[in-house]
């Protein structure tokens, strides 16, 4: 099983890394799942030069920036479409900003890939698009962990009886 960790990266204080770093060991060690963390994989399909400079190109060379980010978009969406078994999206606050998150949720939804949305904010403050793309909604990472542990424990038991 491959879990894709989805959520704001670009405009967050920690680059969207902290929650992912806390959750990934549970997914790997407790569930035995593989994890793709786009916040940690900065190289993706980029050259060393692109990885090192694409952020500065946003203000100095917009065409080069677009070409590079389009490679990232293709890489991430291809991974979701062709390899991910489920997405976990963490939306930290009503002030969060992200362009890629909604696209990733939409691709997963259209492909029938389960989307687990975790957000501590009131449901009326969550984008309707994001809610519609999600299959399960959680108010905490701990609630998600309980759900996943139960969900995949049943799957492991089913495999034992085959």
Regions found by a protein language model. Give the residues of each.
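Conserved catalytic or regulatory cores that recognize and/or transform ribose-phosphate-containing ligands
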Residues: 1-162
